Swiss-Prot record:
<keyword id="KW-0808">Transferase</keyword>
<feature type="region of interest" description="Disordered">
    <location>
        <begin position="1"/>
        <end position="27"/>
    </location>
</feature>
<comment type="pathway">
    <text>Cell surface structure biogenesis; S-layer biogenesis.</text>
</comment>
<comment type="similarity">
    <text>Belongs to the glycosyltransferase 2 family.</text>
</comment>
<feature type="transmembrane region" description="Helical">
    <location>
        <begin position="304"/>
        <end position="324"/>
    </location>
</feature>
<feature type="transmembrane region" description="Helical">
    <location>
        <begin position="270"/>
        <end position="290"/>
    </location>
</feature>
<keyword id="KW-0472">Membrane</keyword>
<feature type="transmembrane region" description="Helical">
    <location>
        <begin position="389"/>
        <end position="409"/>
    </location>
</feature>
<dbReference type="InterPro" id="IPR029044">
    <property type="entry name" value="Nucleotide-diphossugar_trans"/>
</dbReference>
<dbReference type="GO" id="GO:0006486">
    <property type="term" value="P:protein glycosylation"/>
</dbReference>
<dbReference type="GO" id="GO:0016757">
    <property type="term" value="F:glycosyltransferase activity"/>
</dbReference>
<dbReference type="GO" id="GO:0045232">
    <property type="term" value="P:S-layer organization"/>
</dbReference>
<dbReference type="InterPro" id="IPR050256">
    <property type="entry name" value="Glycosyltransferase_2"/>
</dbReference>
<feature type="compositionally biased region" description="Polar residues">
    <location>
        <begin position="16"/>
        <end position="25"/>
    </location>
</feature>
<comment type="function">
    <text>Hexosyltransferase involved in N-glycan biosynthetic pathway that takes place under low-salt conditions (1.75 M instead of 3.4 M). Participates in the formation of the tetrasaccharide present at 'Asn-532' of S-layer glycoprotein Csg, consisting of a sulfated hexose, 2 hexoses and rhamnose. Together with Agl5, mediates the addition of sugars 1 and 2 to dolichol phosphate in the tetrasaccharide.</text>
</comment>
<keyword id="KW-1133">Transmembrane helix</keyword>
<dbReference type="GO" id="GO:0016020">
    <property type="term" value="C:membrane"/>
</dbReference>
Length: 413
């Protein structure tokens, strides 16, 4: 057969067996015929990628499921196994028609990154090779992407059926729902099962996501990137099956890696939002203490002022951290709160240093006035006033802003 410039289904392609008036669309191809080898001249429509680490008990069944899906859809496809096994997984995969590659690095994410660079299909599917995902359910996911209804289609285990013994109760009722909530709030993913491993997406969507994580957090990064870049994600319920072989997942270490990755890539939620909240509470406490008003019989004096000053300083420092993180680390979703946006986009080194210097000088001027009063009073003890706390806060914030502007300037160069 001649090489084709783009992927095509058998019903669209000229067939050698279409004789005696038989049209190409009348020919039904088996899954074995539709699963392409590495040296095939036909461009596959779908590339199915499976990372494997000692999955000899399940790899053959997974490939058979893919063949059944290809036969159901009557499209050409390939199975690419990114293997790091020490058992017979690669031999079994090759015997069943898969293209076996060996990543030159370690990690769940790296296996996918390595494989995605080498697939040939216009559409890419991913899933584990331990029989937990039935690849015969691929058609309903691929159809959503091919029709343009979604950039990425995911199989939802939590909206579908989880067979007994398939998922630990802690994962089903705590871990996965909690991590999904994080991703939905921080990145606007809008999904029910953010860590489902069965996904289908277009090549264009993959290039848009621009993922780079090499560990287990790769699964989170895909959703984070898709949500942050406004890709359309849709789900279909799927059935989750008991796995074949030993599990490679470490619940708490892997779960923490997901949480850590989500937080450090959302400085607005990690730093700016709590910083803004603390600052508002702190300033409110300072105002109440300075004004001397009573609320419900409660008096707000110097102790309230000291607490308000500490909260204001802590909040301002956290908001600076949000600005520094946004500029220095290029997070998936940078902080978009008013302070960070203003500080990173409107404040140059010179302007920030100038504003900080003015605030600093105001605080120092009041401090100088206190010192003068102390000297002229014969070095007698002076009562602590809320205004003293405000002046101290002004000095510290001024210093933070001056040197923070220089740091931000150096990070931005």
């Amino acid at each position: 057969m001649s090489t084709r410039s783009q992927s095509e289904s058998p019903v669209d392609a000229p067939q050698q067996g279409a004789t005696n008036g038989q049209s190409a669309s009348d020919i039904h191809h088996s899954g074995d015929e539709l699963l392409l080898s590495a040296d095939s001249d036909i461009a596959p429509t779908l590339s199915v990628v499976m990372p494997t680490l000692n999955e000899e008990g399940g790899i053959a069944q997974c490939i058979e499921w893919v063949k059944a899906a290809l036969e159901d859809m009557q499209i050409y496809g390939e199975v690419v196994v990114a293997d790091s096994s020490t058992d017979r997984t690669p031999e079994i995969a090759a015997e069943n028609g898969a293209i076996v590659i060996e990543p030159d690095g370690k990690g769940y994410g790296y296996a996918y990154l390595y494989a995605f660079e080498r697939v040939r299909g216009d559409y890419i599917a991913m899933g584990d090779a331990d029989c937990t995902y039935d690849f015969e359910e691929l058609p309903k996911l691929l159809n959503m992407v091919r029709s343009g209804d979604a950039d990425m289609a995911m199989g939802s285990r939590l909206e579908g059926e989880i067979l007994p013994g398939s998922m630990p109760p802690l994962h089903e009722h705590v871990g996965n729902p909690l991590l999904t909530k994080f991703l939905n709030v921080f990145y606007g993913a809008g999904v029910s099962d953010a860590h489902s491993g069965m996904r289908v997406f277009s090549r264009d969507a993959w290039e848009t996501m621009d993922c780079s994580s090499t560990g287990m957090e790769f699964a989170s990064e895909m959703i984070m990137e898709a949500g942050a870049k406004d890709l359309e994600i849709k789900e279909k319920p799927i059935t989750y099956h008991p796995r074949e072989g030993e599990a490679n997942l470490e619940s708490f270490p892997d779960g923490w890696r997901h949480v850590r990755f989500m937080l450090v890539n959302a400085p607005g939620y990690l730093f700016s939002a709590p910083g803004f909240g603390l600052s508002v509470i702190g300033v409110l406490a300072l105002v109440l203490a300075w004004s001397g008003v009573e609320v419900g019989g409660a008096q707000f004096g110097i102790h309230t002022g000291i607490g308000g000053g500490l909260l204001t300083l802590a909040g301002f420092q956290l908001m600076l951290f949000g600005a520094f993180s946004t500029v220095s680390s290029d997070p998936v979703r940078g902080a978009s709160d008013p302070f960070t946006t203003w500080f990173t986009e409107r404040i140059s080194l010179e302007r920030g240093a100038t504003i900080g210097s003015v605030v600093l000088l105001c605080g120092l001027a009041y401090g100088g006035l206190l010192a003068f009063t102390w000297v002229t009073s014969g070095f007698s003890a002076l009562p602590i006033a809320v205004a003293d706390v405000v002046a101290t806060v002004a000095v510290v914030i001024g210093l933070q802003m001056v040197f923070g502007s220089f740091l931000l300037g150096s990070l931005g160069e």
